[in-house]
Amino acid sequence: MKPKPSQFKNLERMLGLKTEQLDAVKVTIELKDKILIIENPTVIKMIAQGQEIYSVIGEAKEAQKEEPKVEIKDEDVKFVMEQTGKGEQEVKEALQKANGDIAKAILLLTGQET
């Protein structure tokens, strides 16, 4: 048995809820290790006791989260090579792992940081 829209309106009024259907095109939810993307969702905004609640209905597709690429400067590579005696590729990898932090890259290359 399907509830009637008027029953929902009565329930909303009794509970003090205000609802609004939003004209959403896409919803993206970013998690620690992945991204959920819901295309053409049904999104309902509810306000209850001053709090906003969003209900999202639709089929989610998973996407991999991309790590931000760190731009490594040539002068940083040269400096770290001079300080550690390591090769260019090894220094670039250490700088990437250290998110461009020169001091941390040197520590990684000299075995002082894990």
Swiss-Prot record:
Keywords per UniProt? Protein transport, RNA-binding, Transport
Can the keyword S-adenosyl-L-methionine be found in this entry's annotation? no
Please, one GO biological process term?
Answer: protein transport
| UniProt keyword Chloroplast, yes or no | no
Entry-linked InterPro entries: NAC-like_UBA (IPR044034), NAC_A/B_dom_sf (IPR038187), NAC_arc (IPR005231), Nas_poly-pep-assoc_cplx_dom (IPR002715), UBA-like_sf (IPR009060)
Question: One Pfam annotation, family name?
Answer: NAC
The UniProt record lists the NAC-A/B domain at 5-69
The record ties this protein, via CDD domains, to: UBA_AeNAC
Q: Which Gene3D superfamilies match?
A: DNA helicase RuvA subunit, C-terminal domain, Nascent polypeptide-associated complex domain
GO molecular function annotations of the record = RNA binding
In the UniProt record, the signal sequence range is none
Q: Which NCBIfam families match?
A: archaeal-type nascent polypeptide-associated complex protein
Family to which this protein belongs? Belongs to the NAC-alpha family.
Subunit and interaction comment: Homodimer. Interacts with the ribosome. Binds ribosomal RNA.
Q: What does this protein do?
A: Contacts the emerging nascent chain on the ribosome.
Q: What name does the UniProt record give this protein?
A: Nascent polypeptide-associated complex protein
This protein's species is Sulfurisphaera tokodaii (strain DSM 16993 / JCM 10545 / NBRC 100140 / 7) (Sulfolobus tokodaii)
From the broadest rank down, the organism's phylogenetic lineage runs:
Archaea, Thermoproteota, Thermoprotei, Sulfolobales, Sulfolobaceae
This protein's gene is called nac
